[in-house]
From Swiss-Prot:
Family annotation (Pfam families): DnaJ, DnaJ_C
Domain called J: residue spans: 5-69
Protein's name according to its UniProt entry: Curved DNA-binding protein
GO biological process terms held by the UniProt record: chaperone cofactor-dependent protein refolding; protein refolding
CDD domains to which the protein is assigned, alphabetical: DnaJ, DnaJ_C
Lineage: Bacteria, Pseudomonadati, Pseudomonadota, Gammaproteobacteria, Enterobacterales
Listed NCBIfam families: PRK10266.1
Keyword Cytoplasm included in the entry's annotation: yes
Principal subcellular localization: cytoplasm
Organism: Escherichia coli (strain K12)
Length: 306
């Protein structure tokens, strides 16, 4: 056997960090992948790169490889490592080779530790009305399975029935313990995180825990006052428009906003004065009478003043 120069195979230096080595591995793996590369030795080069990555991507295994590389010219190393057949070992033989050269204690000390699985995040769309009460939801996602090189080898479909609590907010994260990818060497599974996305509503805008709704009113309703029916998340209510209301005025309806464990928000009705269509002759005459009666009123009196 002969000890390969894994750093040369990857085109990196022994002092390079894992990020640099990982970048080199991905580049070479794409270059020599048998399904992509046209080079005659692509398959052999791909296996060689994968073998180098398996060793250099593991901190303990890389340290042991560096130690073996430093001793490659020592007589004792040559007696135990070389068999004269000119073949190189692969990463699967690494434990046995290292322990035969440096002793059983070294092998025991490099046992790979238990590693926690990866977390997974998925976005869950929730309608505003659904935030008022706890509800059940069936979610589906793909559980990635990683190979020895840290790359996704396959994805396994998975379905869960979950409870979405009342009062969830936009961007809130819900943890489902142990529903992520499996751990390695007895390590715990990762978690699944549900990231809540409140779907846009055709009527309501969210402002913190409060809701805003634009309420169209006629000029005479704004001037004289009125009672208009306004929807909320639960039911419709009768909203009082005070006389002399202005466009853009906000009327507060207490306790009709979003509900959470800590507080209940309010609903703000934002008035929008809507003019009727182009008036006929009789209607125009009435508008003119109103204009004459309010001739002293100048809506632009303070316009542009600090």
């Amino acid at each position: 056997m002969e000890l390969k120069d894994y750093y040369a195979i990857m085109g990196v230096k022994p002092t390079d960090d894992l990020k640099t080595i990982k970048t080199a591995y991905r580049r070479l793996a794409r270059k020599y992948h048998p399904d992509v590369s046209k080079e005659p030795d692509a398959e052999a080069r791909f296996k060689e790169v994968a073998e180098a990555w398996e060793v250099l991507s593991d901190e303990q295994r890389r340290a042991e490889y560096d130690q073996m590389w430093q001793h490659r010219n020592d007589p004792q190393f040559n007696r135990q490592f070389h068999h004269g057949d000119g073949q190189s070992f692969n990463a699967e033989d690494f434990d046995d080779i290292f322990s035969s050269i440096f002793g059983q204690h070294a092998r025991q000390s490099r046992q790979r530790p238990a590693t926690r699985g990866h977390d997974i995040e998925i976005e869950v769309a929730v309608f505003l009305e659904e935030t008022l009460t706890e509800h059940k939801r069936t979610i589906s996602y793909n559980l990635p399975v990683y190979n020895a090189f840290g790359m996704i080898e396959q994805e396994i479909p998975k379905t869960l029935n979950v409870k979405i609590p009342a009062g969830v907010g936009n961007g809130q994260r819900i943890r489902l313990k142990g529903q992520g990818t499996p751990g390695e060497n007895g390590g715990p599974n990762g978690d699944l995180w549900l990231v809540i996305h409140i779907a846009p509503h055709p009527l309501f805008d969210i402002v913190g825990q409060d809701l805003e709704i634009v309420v169209p009113v006629s000029p005479w309703e704004a001037a004289l006052g009125a009672k208009v029916t306004v929807p909320t998340l639960k039911e419709s209510i009768l909203l009082t428009i005070p006389p002399g209301s202005q466009a853009g005025q906000r009327l507060r309806v207490k306790g009709k906003g979003l509900v959470s464990k800590k507080q209940t928000g309010d609903l703000y009705a934002v008035l929008k004065i809507v003019m009727p269509p182009k008036p006929d002759e009789n209607t125009a005459a009435l508008w003119q009478q109103l204009a004459d009666a309010q001739s002293s009123f100048d809506p632009r009196k303070d316009w542009g003043k600090a």
